[in-house]
C-alpha cells in the first residue's frame, strides 16, 4: 500500500528529543519493512511558532513569516532523515517532483513546507494526491476530527467516521471561530475531498499508533471516507 504520513511538528519535535524522533523513524521503518511505499511530511510545531512570533515582532511580513516556517519544517525533516539513515532521501524534498522521484528511486521522501501560504497539512494532502497514495495519515496532537475545537469547547464531540464533504463543512465552521484551530486546515480538507483519498486523523504522540492504523486499520481517531 502507498501511504503518506503527515507528522505534526508538535508531535515529532515539541522539544529537541532524539529518542522521540528515533521512535518515529522506527515506526516508519517498520511500515517500510512490511512492504508499504511511504512518503512523510513533517510540520514545524512550537519551534516554528516561536521563530514566527519573534520575526513578526521584528516587522517581518506574512510571506517572510511563511518562509521562516518552511525553513523550520525542513530542519525537523532533517532530524527524521538522520534517524531514518539510508532509507530516506538525503535531504528534505523541496518540491512534489523531488518527493515523487525519491519514491521512484525506492527512498522514503521527507517533505516539509513547499510554498508560502500553504501549511504542511495541505502539503501532505497534495503530495498524497500527486503520488496516488492509497492512504493519508495525519499524526497530530489531537485525537481526531471534532465538531468544534475541543480546546475551546468542552462539549465538542469527535467523529469516528465522516465523509470528505462533511469534513470540509466541519473545518470551515471551526476556522470561522476566532481563536479556534482544527486538526487539518481547510485547504487540506478540500484536497482530500477532491482526491478521494482515504484519510485517518489520530493522536500521534505514540508512533506505534500510526503502525497499527496502517497495518491493522485499528486506531483511536477519525476516518475520512471518500464520497461515493
Curated annotation (Swiss-Prot):
Pathway the protein acts in: Pyrimidine metabolism; CTP biosynthesis via de novo pathway; UDP from UMP (UMPK route): step 1/1
Alphabetical GO biological process terms: 'de novo' CTP biosynthetic process; UDP biosynthetic process
InterPro entries, sorted: AceGlu_kinase-like_sf (IPR036393), Asp/Glu/Uridylate_kinase (IPR001048), Uridylate_kinase (IPR011817), Uridylate_kinase_arch/spir (IPR011818)
CDD domains: AAK_UMPK-PyrH-Pf
E.C. number(s) listed in UniProt: 2.7.4.22
Sorted UniProt keywords: ATP-binding, Cytoplasm, Kinase, Nucleotide-binding, Pyrimidine biosynthesis, Transferase
Top-level taxon: Archaea
Residues noted as binding UMP in the record, renumbered to the chain: 44, 66, 114-120
One of the Pfam families matching this protein, by short name: AA_kinase
Binding site for ATP: 9-10, 45, 49, 140, 146, 149
Cellular compartment(s): Cytoplasm
Broad class of the protein's primary localization: cytoplasm
Regulation: Inhibited by UTP.
Catalysed transformations (reactions): UMP + ATP = UDP + ADP
One GO CC term, this protein: cytoplasm
GO terms for MF: ATP binding; UMP kinase activity
PANTHER family registered for this protein in UniProt: URIDYLATE KINASE, URIDYLATE KINASE PUMPKIN, CHLOROPLASTIC
Known role: Catalyzes the reversible phosphorylation of UMP to UDP.
Assembly notes: Homohexamer.
Family from the record: Belongs to the UMP kinase family.
Cross-referenced HAMAP family: PyrH_A
UniProt protein name: Uridylate kinase
